[in-house]
Regions:
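Juxtamembrane intracellular "pre-TM" segments in multi-pass secondary transporters
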Residues: 2-10, 188-220
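Cytoplasmic helix-loop-helix junction between adjacent transmembrane helices
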Residues: 108-144
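Conserved MFS/SLC helix-loop-helix module at the cytosolic interface between two early adjacent transmembrane helices
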Residues: 64-102
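Helix-loop-helix hairpin linking two adjacent transmembrane segments in secondary transporters
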Residues: 141-188
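Helix-breaking motifs and short loop linkers at transmembrane-helix boundaries and internal kinks
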Residues: 45, 77, 98-103, 115, ...
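C-terminal transmembrane helical hairpin of 12-TM major facilitator-type secondary transporters
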Residues: 280-325
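Helix-to-loop junctions at the C-terminal end of transmembrane segments
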Residues: 66-77, 265-279, 363
Length: 396
């Protein structure tokens, strides 16, 4: 499977699907904690806000990893970067499993976030080395694997946490990462860097990309705001489901993650039609679906039908926004794909962290309704960026 890759010459399907699977396995580490937050709160005797902070600091770690580590994909051997990150992940997951102190858990969660950025090294590989007509499709395959990992992580952690304890989830996750490390050693070919220079010059070039290509900031910001509204739901769902009339345990919260499978299945379809339909149209559709989802979350807050319908719409809407924007950014400057993706995903997860923080505050003030109103405001701002961008493009 170790074939040399050349830009725009194509990527073997076997390698593509291995990367998609490993993208799912590695990104899952960001989301294992979400169905377990209430269990962790009880076990460590902490407040709901402190438990919510575990999720937020994991997202902040991911944003930091995106900004400081992913750009190295243009400067160093990508395979070496992946192996180092996987090794640190194994250690941080084990530490989480043994954590008795909230501050140790915070630090280990941050490191887990930092080193879970590997899927964002795989995405540029798919974009850069696929033949032009397959770029959207192949990026969609990686994203589908990533989404499947997110969905499976919540289901897995919810069920395992309920029956074997929340700590066992992270020990098993460490084993998954050990297996992933071995797979990467054997299947990922050497991919030479495209940037000539040092790390300082590389980081400076990231800033210059933002200045040189204004659409990059537009694509990133509107996706980030939507992602904030998306994570607001998942970071507080465990608290919502423990209350009347559900009184649900972590395994039920995890199983609700299956509802997002429609979003995962839609990723490849969306990637295929981004050029034909247009990124703006997908953004409007995505914002509409997410806004309706939160209305359903309010009206049907005490029914499984309302919760499930809301999750499905929220997930599909999020994929419309993320994938259309992320696919489009790689056309801006193909030779800087890792750095372009760094800007997008760093801003994207900053938005997710802000959404998680706002959700924690909103939950404290007005529980589920507070989270809903905060999320709807984020979605409106995301839509406004698309509307303003459309009006400005007409003027020019």
């Amino acid at each position: 499977m170790k074939e040399n890759l050349e830009i725009d010459k194509g990527i073997p399907n076997s390698l593509l699907w291995v990367l998609a699977i490993l993208a799912g396995v590695s990104v899952a580490n960001l989301y294992y904690n979400q169905p377990l937050l209430n269990m962790i709160r009880v076990d460590l005797d902490i407040t709901a806000f402190q438990a919510n902070f575990i999720s937020m600091i994991t997202q902040i770690g991911y944003a930091a990893g995106l900004f400081f580590i992913v750009p190295l994909g243009d400067l160093l051997n990508k395979k070496k970067i992946v192996l180092i990150n996987f090794t640190i992940l194994i250690l941080s997951l084990v530490v989480i499993g043994f954590s008795k102190n909230i501050w140790v858990l915070f630090v280990a969660s941050f490191l887990t976030g930092v080193c879970s950025i590997v899927p964002q090294i795989f995405v540029p590989i798919a974009a850069q080395y696929s033949i032009p007509k397959n770029k959207g499709r192949n990026v969609g395959i990686i994203i589908s694997g990533l989404l499947a990992g997110i969905l499976a992580s919540r289901v897995f952690s919810g069920i395992v946490g309920e029956y074997l304890g929340w700590r066992t989830v992270f020990f098993i996750a460490a084993v998954f990462m050990l297996i992933s490390t071995i797979v990467i050693m054997f299947v990922l070919p050497r991919i030479d860097p495209t940037f000539k220079g040092n790390y300082r010059g590389l980081m400076k070039s990231i800033i210059s990309l933002v200045v040189k290509f204004p659409p990059l900031l537009i694509y990133s910001s509107r996706a980030a705001l939507a992602f904030g509204a998306f994570l607001a739901m998942w970071s507080t769902l465990a608290f919502k489901m423990q209350l009347a009339p559900f009184y649900a345990s972590s395994n039920i919260v995890g199983l609700l993650g299956i509802c997002g499978i429609i979003g995962a299945l839609s990723a490849s379809f969306i990637g295929k039609y981004v050029k034909q339909v247009g990124v703006r149209t997908f953004n409007v559709i995505g914002c509409f679906l997410m806004f309706v989802a939160w209305i359903i979350f309010i009206l049907g807050e005490n029914t499984y039908g309302g919760i499930i319908s809301g999750i499905i719409l929220l997930d599909v809407g999020m994929q419309c926004i993320q994938l259309s924007n992320q696919t489009s950014i790689f056309e801006i400057c193909p030779n800087a794909s890792s750095r372009i993706n760094t800007v997008f995903m760093t801003i994207y997860f900053i938005g997710g962290s802000i959404g998680t923080l706002l959700a924690g505050i909103a939950w404290k003030i007005n529980k589920w309704h507070g989270v809903a109103y905060a999320s709807m405001i984020l979605i409106i701002f995301s839509l406004l960026i698309t509307i303003v961008e459309r009006l400005m493009s007409k003027r020019h």
